[in-house]
Amino acid sequence: MRVRGSKADGTPWRVAIEKPTPMAREVQRILELHEASGVAVMTSGTYRNFFEAGGQRYSHILDPRTGRPVTHRLLSTTVLDENPTLADAWSTALLCVGEVEGARLAESEGLKALFIYGEDGQLRESMSSHFSAAPVAR
C-alpha cells in the first residue's frame, strides 16, 4: 500500500498492522502516515500461509540461502519506504533472515522496519531506529 499527503479533512492516513496470529484478524499497531512525498507500507509474514508436519510449522516464505521454509521465531516484518517495490522486497528479505540479522541489516541499510516475533508465548515488537524516528503512531 502507498499513501501520500493526508486525507481530504487534513488528518493522517491510518494503516493497521495486523497481529500475526493464524485464524484471527486483529490489529497489532496503528500507523498514522502523513508524509507529503508519499510512503509505502509493506508487510511480510509467516502466519497466514503455512502447513504443519511432525509438530513443525512450515511457512511459504523460503530462505534463499537454504531453499527451505524459514523456521525462526520472526512472524512479521513491516517496512516503510518511498518506493513500494523496495519496501516489499526488504520486508521479505528481512523476514527471511530473522529478527537478529534482520535488525542489523535494517540499521545498516537505513530501513524503517518493524519486527514482530514470538517469545515465551507472547508477541514482541522491535524496530529499527529509523522506524522509531518516523512520524507514525506508537
Predicted segment positions?
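Mature catalytic core of soluble alpha/beta enzymes
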Residues: 1-138
